[in-house]
Amino acid sequence: MRLTVKQVTWLKVCLHLAGLLPFLWLVWAINHGGLGADPVKDIQHFTGRTALKFLLATLLITPLARYAKQPLLIRTRRLLGLWCFAWATLHLTSYALLELGVNNLALLGKELITRPYLTLGIISWVILLALAFTSTQAMQRKLGKHWQQLHNFVYLVAILAPIHYLWSVKIISPQPLIYAGLAVLLLALRYKKLLSFFNRLRKQVHNKLSL
């Protein structure tokens, strides 16, 4: 049985709760000693992992809708992507304000040079920013065929974000490996589209360098 519009609407409500409840828990944990010995790192890792979960969920929607024959499920993809961006922004903000401090934001440029995993994180966030800004139907109509080309950059985020996570942890544990494995699996499900995206990107870079 296929999902109805009403059921998808309720599903969106549940997904909004899934995006909001972790934030409420984090606020509670901060105020009630629910974090570990290094609360700053805990906040950074929690926000980053939550962003990664929503990224993976976003990538899951298309193959799930196709194989389950639930076309209306696609309507939840934008919502999940926006929650991914929201949590990625919280992740970046927690690093900038809690790790560096308001008075040391000028050090961010130096940090990006000395810690390459931060560069991967910033690149991922900038891409997510562009995708969030252009996620509306109005922007889709305005950009035309270029809209899909832009939004295919989510595949690059799906590669960079797990590497950023793996690189940032001092001790490799199963958790970042699981996230990386899930990202590889979700990318493998659309390998033809992935190859087409990177071939087009390679040609564009080559053309720019040839000018």
UniProtKB/Swiss-Prot annotation:
What the record notes about the co-factor is: Binds 1 FMN per subunit.
Q: Does the keyword Transport apply?
A: yes
Q: Name one GO cellular component term.
A: plasma membrane
What's its membrane topology? Answer: Multi-pass membrane protein
Keyword Transmembrane belongs to the record: yes
Q: Which Pfam families match?
A: Ferric_reduct
Main site of residence?
membrane
Q: Which GO terms describe its molecular function?
A: electron transfer activity; FMN binding; heme binding; metal ion binding; oxidoreductase activity, acting on diphenols and related substances as donors
> Could you tell me where this protein is found in the cell?
Cell inner membrane
Signal sequence: where? none
Q: Known InterPro entries for this protein?
A: Fe3_Rdtase_TM_dom, MsrQ-like
Cofactor (UniProt):
FMN; heme b
Q: For this UniProt record, give its keywords in alphabetical order, as a comma-separated list.
A: Cell inner membrane, Cell membrane, Electron transport, Flavoprotein, FMN, Heme, Iron, Membrane, Metal-binding, Transmembrane, Transmembrane helix, Transport
Single GO biological process annotation from the record: protein repair
Q: Where are the transmembrane segments?
A: 10-30, 82-102, 116-136, 153-173, 178-198
Protein origin, superkingdom: Bacteria
Oligomer and partners:
Heterodimer of a catalytic subunit (MsrP) and a heme-binding subunit (MsrQ).
Into which family does the record put it? Belongs to the MsrQ family.
Q: Which PANTHER family match?
A: PROTEIN-METHIONINE-SULFOXIDE REDUCTASE HEME-BINDING SUBUNIT MSRQ
What this protein is reported to do is described as: Part of the MsrPQ system that repairs oxidized periplasmic proteins containing methionine sulfoxide residues (Met-O), using respiratory chain electrons. Thus protects these proteins from oxidative-stress damage caused by reactive species of oxygen and chlorine generated by the host defense mechanisms. MsrPQ is essential for the maintenance of envelope integrity under bleach stress, rescuing a wide series of structurally unrelated periplasmic proteins from methionine oxidation, including the primary periplasmic chaperone SurA and the lipoprotein Pal.
What this protein is called in its record is Protein-methionine-sulfoxide reductase heme-binding subunit MsrQ
